[in-house]
Regions:
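Structural preference for solvent-exposed beta-strand-turn elements
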Residues: 1-195
Length: 195
């Protein structure tokens, strides 16, 4: 069964079409209308070995908040839908990724219980025109709509761009491991019998 999903979300603030294929690393196409965020989602697709297609626009003349948050909603919904019954998945994933002077660790559990721990601080308030505070909003929206428990911890780092890259790469690698299917797992990896 193909583990892929498409989400279309249109509000007065944003217009988003997002697709993910968890089992394909074919070329992705990402156009969020926020160049820095395109770069982060491209890193996510590449390091997770996911095919991700995004076309979106929003009220970025105000700021990027609505669009970044809604992209988190859509990615969370898409991952949740693509996982389906979650039969055979590893469930847990963890990854540490260095990026020059910084190191970030991401741990996650596809538990059906959305929760975010986000311990990341930035020295700069803007990267080009992008507000680093929106990264937390993205991941909060993602966890709320995917049912995933997600812990993001920056061990150290000073360059805001490097920190965000490290976060997205670690997130991608942890999610890749968690969604991987292991033939030894019968049903779902839970004593409750469901996730």
């Amino acid at each position: 069964m193909a583990r892929k999903a498409k989400i279309v979300r249109k509000t007065k603030e944003t217009d988003i079409a997002l697709e993910i294929d968890l089992d394909s690393n074919a070329a992705s196409s990402i156009d969020t209308s926020i160049p820095f965020f395109d770069h982060m989602l491209d890193l996510f697709a590449r390091h997770g070995f996911f095919k991700v297609m995004v076309k979106s626009k929003g009220d970025t003349q105000i700021d990027d908040h609505h669009l970044v948050e809604d992209l988190g909603i859509c990615l969370g919904m898409a991952v949740g839908k693509a996982l389906g019954s979650k039969v055979g998945i590893n469930r847990y994933g963890a990854a540490s990724v260095p990026m020059d002077e910084c190191l970030c660790r991401v741990d996650l559990d596809i538990s059906g219980r959305p929760y975010l721990i986000y311990k990341v601080k930035f020295e700069r308030r803007k990267i080009g025109g992008f507000d680093p505070a929106l990264v937390k909003e993205f991941f909060k929206a993602f966890t709320d709509h995917s049912g995933i428990t997600l812990h993001i911890n920056l061990a150290y780092g000073s360059n805001s761009h490097h920190i965000i890259e490290s976060v997205f790469k670690a997130f991608a690698r942890a999610l890749r491991d968690a969604v991987a299917v292991d033939k030894k797992i019968k049903g779902v990896l839970s004593t409750k019998g469901s996730l």
